[in-house]
Every structure is written in structure tokens, then in C-alpha cells.
Amino acid sequence: MEVQINVIARMKSDYPTKFGIPRQPHLVQELRATIVFEPEYRNADALRGIEGFSHLWIIWQFSEAVRSGWSPTVRPPRLGGNTRMGVFATRSPFRPNNLGLSCVKLLGVEQTKEQGTVLHVSGADLMDGTPIFDIKPYIPYADSHPDALGGFTDTAGEFLLEVDFPADLLALLPEGKRAAAIGVLSHDPRPSYQRKPGRIYGLPFAGFDIRFTVEEENLTVCEVVPL
């Protein structure tokens, strides 16, 4: 059976490509983004009361991962990219309907002249232009489960790199983007299958290409170039 689902909004973020996007929402809370509604959904009444919630659920599409067919198993980056798990036991973008689910923090609601009412959020893990299908409020009494188990993610742990971002290069970024850039780099933006020591990688972020190398647990930024 096929169903039709409409795009209600798109995410405006600092990521022009999927490279380097945090693998989960809220890993880098300094990241800022804006939800811009499609013209037919720019009705302020549809957002009445939303300012009373601190967090929102975003249902969206992995638009860069759409492909024909699907695989019942995938390789989660958190397991090094070598171990296969069932697709429905992971948050992999390579799934039957390519749907993503993210919880973001609502920073504010703004009425604009050109784009109607927009939502400013933080902690989003979405590429610029990502299609959004629905928005729902996060309800603490129903959505929070302190005793929840995290499956294989409980044992994988959270590993952060030490980031050496020289002051002269960091100064090339807008002041409001610096903390977010360091946060993104600390989570090792490299794909799990492309981690060669000494190789120079480029992270497109906030209008710049941030080039870096990684040796063991240390990431060093070597160049910042405007895109």
C-alpha cells in the first residue's frame, strides 16, 4: 500500500552536505537551526501554544539516503561500521521509508515578513533543506523514560576527540559559530570506514570548509576556507 505524505517545512541549518552532521540530536547543543514552513502551511494558528513547550519532535526525511530497495541489516557507526544490526534496531538513514525522528530544543518563535512564522531550534542533526513532514511537542510525562535501556548503544560509550583549533583559524568563523564548530569536530565527523591517520578531511560548515587531520585521539584544524 502506498500513501502520500506532504512536506510541511524545511530545515535551514549550517550543513550544506551530510558530512559531519552529528549522528544524534543534541550531541552538540550549540548548533542552531531554523524551521521554515512551506507557503501552504504558514498559518500562525497551526503553532498556537507551541511556545509553551521547551522541546519538539521533528519527523523528517533522510533526503540524501533515498534509494530503491532496502536491506534488513545495517552497520551502525557506533559499533565501528563493521558489525551488522537489524535496521529497525538502529537509527540508520538507510531504511524502508527513510524517515528520521529528532528531538530538538525550541529556542523561539519568530514572525517574519517573507517566511511567516519560523521556529528557531538547537541541537538539530539535519542538513540544510531537509524536508520535514511533521512537528509534535515533546511531553515530559509521556516521553521521558529514565529506566529505558539503550541496547548496544549502552556499551558503545561516547568518545570525544581533543580539538586543536588554532586561534587565528578559529577567528575566521563568525563568533556565534565557533563553539558549535568545535563541538561538531570533537564528535569525529569522519565516516567510520574512512579513518586514515594523516589524511586531510574537509567539513563544510556555516559557509566554510574546515580542513583537519586526526592522529589517535587528537584532531587538528589546519585550514579554514570560505565556500
For each feature predicted by the language model, list its residue ranges.
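Mixed-charge, low-complexity intrinsically disordered regions
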Residues: 1-99, 111-120, 124-227
